[in-house]
Amino acid sequence: MKKGLLAISIIALSSITLLAQNEIDALRFSQDAPLGTARFSAMSGAFGSLGGEFSALSLNPAGIGMYQFSEFSFTPSFNLNSNTSYYGDKETDYKSGLKIGNIGLVFSSLRENSEWKRINFAIGWNQLANYDSNIRIQGENNTSSIADNILAISQGNSINELNTLYSAPAFWTNLIDLANNSVDTITDSYTHDNGNYISHVNGNSSKTQTKNIHSSGGKNEFIFSIGGSFNEQLYLGATIGVPTLDYYEKSTYSETNFEDTINGLQGFDLHEELSVYGAGLNLKLGAILRVSENLKLGASLHTPTAYSIEETFSTSLTTHFIEESFTERSNTNHFEYDLITPWKAILSASSLLNKNILLSADYEIVDYSFSSMHSSQYTFTDENNVIQKLYTKASNIRLGAEINIKPFVVRAGYSKYGSAFANKDYSKENFSFGLGINNGGYYLDAAYVLSQGNGEHLIYNEDYINPVSLVNTNHSLVFTLGFRY
């Protein structure tokens, strides 16, 4: 019997596959993976004490005081991302695309009769994270089904009380059913609407489980910087950052090739769609001290970013039986909340050797357990408790080198971003290389960046299934064209 459509008004605040408004969002939007200009990228972002580089204004704004000319820079990049999953089968999926890493304008002014030799201003835009990726997961499972998860959260609820994102679509497409689904022919209503449900999937029989996840978007920051040089020895600066979030995720989870089902179910597809938009505000303060002609030290402090975020989330479920298929779509759920990201502190040092070899290093510390979520619609008590228990303090290291071999400049870098998890090592490494030509009035730089890291994805509730291991690899080609005037 095909079930009719019933209006459901319950708003579900969380996804059984952990997609919306939870600790995963808090971590995703708290982490940075800056790309920026080609010079910045080629040296793996180790610019905390170097200065004179637009992307560095999102790290240590004191570097603006080292500009001796006004400057414009523009950076496009090409990215190829791959994700390999290990869930019985080894699956690899790819995504490529073009991004803008930087657009920046610096205004430099010389003050000849003042100890503050320069007061400089900058306005522009830096890329802080790229969310483009495709993930494919596939394997055989004879111990559980996502239908078991849906059945568990449905039990004890009448039809009108079913979760609108998962339980109600599962019921109206016959993935789950009332244990006694007798219908009163006069009232056309169920006679045993008592919250006792059964699943049409035998979780303990063999089946193929497949999930495809397509993500896109990024985190970018508009910056407004001011800074100066005191006797060309002490450099101070401040940046007001206005980061923006744009994240879209669409996933399809399928179960097929059932060894044993009920009522002739051949398979089903669960679609989830998440859109996130947000904007925030932060302040960055920094200082660089020229200890000697060949040594500079830097320090900077980033306040938490206060984000206002709006999410929309919806699902649809299609079941395939021998004779027909059924599809049911949830309403689109709109949700607004605030996210507070952690403080960040950076210590830096750089040295110039033989006037043509530049070495630099940054040490950065950020405590991801500081993140918190807030809303007038929901308390987020459980999510904030999970953030404090699950996440920890992470140390990030960036190393860079530059050799001037006229007319070219050769650069290389390495960085390691520590794991945000208290009990799991999901650190990330970057290896980079680049070349540049500096002709005084203009410069042209190119860089290649290889990023590698491990992670995991939970297909559905961890009470039923273990997380799937992921290996993420990203290749970036970055080009910057700049003009000085």
Q: Model-derived features: where do they sit?
A:
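Bacterial Sec-dependent N-terminal signal peptides
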Residues: M1-I24, L481
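Outer-membrane beta-barrel translocator/receptor signature
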Residues: A38, L50-L59, G65-N142, N220
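Short structured motifs
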Residues: L59-N60, I465
